[in-house]
Every structure is written in structure tokens, then in C-alpha cells.
Amino acid sequence: PIFGITNTHKDFAWLPQALESLISAEMWYPMITATVGHTYRQIVNKYYDLTCDDNVPRRRALGNFDFRGDMGVDAALKASAGWLLSFVNTATVPAIPFMKEMYNCDYSTEEVGFGAVSTEHFVMCSNSAIDIVNNPDDTYEYKDIDPMRERVFLKRLLTELYPNTSFSCVCDSYDYWNVVKNILPTLKDEILTHNGC
């Protein structure tokens, strides 16, 4: 157990269990996300040491995007606060003032958390339709909305929209493994020359 409360008075034998339940319910979720974040940070540190030859801040290596899928605003704030102990990228922007309140962070002078440039499923899916409408004479071989059409938008993200900043990209709108195995290898040059963080 993470903590224990011992009863010291026979008339209050019920109190420790009640308090333990309340405290555990409030602490468990942020502790889990803090532990996961810390574990991921150890992995990031290890592989940055082995593979990176630049000064990219390790605290910016990963981000959490759980706000929309969490169990409510309170849960999202606590989960993101746990994550922000190891990394600074979050889609749960309200967690930044929460960190100030709970951890006495001064986000005017220190890196507490940042929102990240990122795509969403809707953006990735609708871009194919927009691309087809805007380019009716396109000679691209995939004329219909097709998973391979994601390549067009991924290239645009890398070379036109965000050529000088890092961004997060949803890659599972159609077929995640198609993106990893087939699309990203064709964009190797664009990825390697991209001027992200």
C-alpha cells in the first residue's frame, strides 16, 4: 500500500478505512500517471544518451493527449499534473494553472507545461477530401479518399505548414501500420530535413 492509517481510538475504528478510501480515490490516478511519466522519462533519457546528437530538451520528448478521453475535467487535470512532473507537453492546458495551485509552480519563470501543435482524427480524415476538391486535376494515383492519401497531408505538414517546428500527428485515422510501414518510409528525406525541435 502507498500509505496506511492506524486507528488510535476504539470509538473510531471505522475512520481509517473511510479516510484511506477517500485519500486513495484522490491520489491513485495522478500517482499512476506520474509513475508512467517517470518510467517513460527514464526510457527517453536512456535512448537520448544513445542516439541524440543535439540538445533537444528531454522534457519535450513526449506529450499526453488524454484530456478528451478522460473521466472528466478533474481527472484530466490530476492525470496531466502527474505527467507534467516528467514532461512538459500536454493537451490538457488547464493543468498548467493547476500545477501552479497544487505544486506552487511559477509558469511565468519556469517550464511547467505547453500545448503542442497537433493534428486530430478529423483533420487527418477531412484533409483527403479537401485535397481532392482543391486539386481536381491532380495526377496523384489515389483519386478517392484512400489511406495512402494521408501521405499528401503528412508531406504538407512537414514541408509547408510546420517546416520549422515540431508537431504531433495522429496516424491511426485509417491504418496506423500502413502509415508506419508504407507512408513514412517514402517521406524519409522530408523527415530527416525537417527543422523541428
Task: Kindly give the residue locations of the regions a language model identified.
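Buried, small/hydrophobic-residue-enriched core segments of structured protein domains
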Residues: 3-197
